């Protein structure tokens, strides 16, 4: 933005682990990603200040235009492809953004450019085969098919063809609504000033009408 790249879109990306509780020992052993997943991405996007600092600088909704969700099997597939094609064996959590970019590239014009940055450490996770062996020992079904039928904690479905790798777009308005709800809860707010409204507009990258509508739903008085 500061460099004047106002036409550039910023995408976030996570592996879909919907339904698995991050604090559950049983669920923990049924997920093949301990980072780079929705169990971190969604809570920290909608409530950035619940981390171990008074005010977090990582405020994703200020900048993120879209949030792409990919499946476990898709990331394992891209991890193996990267290993075979480029000789780079890492991840799989460190290939989350690359998988989302691969899916996104299928939607864009051929002259458009995607810059991929893995915010997770690129060696995140054990060797893919070790992780898959452990998953199988925990009763997770491993198979090839439609990765969109992947159910976290139940199966891992690898695509039969790379064209099957398609990212899902998370509902950004839902994230932003949750952010405002959490911000209100943090300070037990019953009223909001013009400065508060301006702050929430900047935090959610939304217009005044959206912020006022959500605050009204939460019974917050504007003063």
Residue ranges, per PLM feature:
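Active-site/ligand-binding loops adjacent to catalytic centers
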Residues: 3-89, 131-217
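Flexible, glycine/charged-enriched surface loops at secondary-structure junctions
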Residues: 86-97, 110-113
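Conserved, well-ordered active-site substructure
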Residues: 113-116, 126-132
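Short beta-strand segments
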Residues: 11-14, 115-119
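Glycine-rich phosphate/diphosphate-binding loops that line cofactor/substrate pockets in enzymes
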Residues: 104-112, 188-192
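Flexible loop/turn segments at secondary-structure boundaries
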Residues: 18-22, 98-99, 122-126
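Buried hydrophobic packing segments
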Residues: 1, 79, 97-105
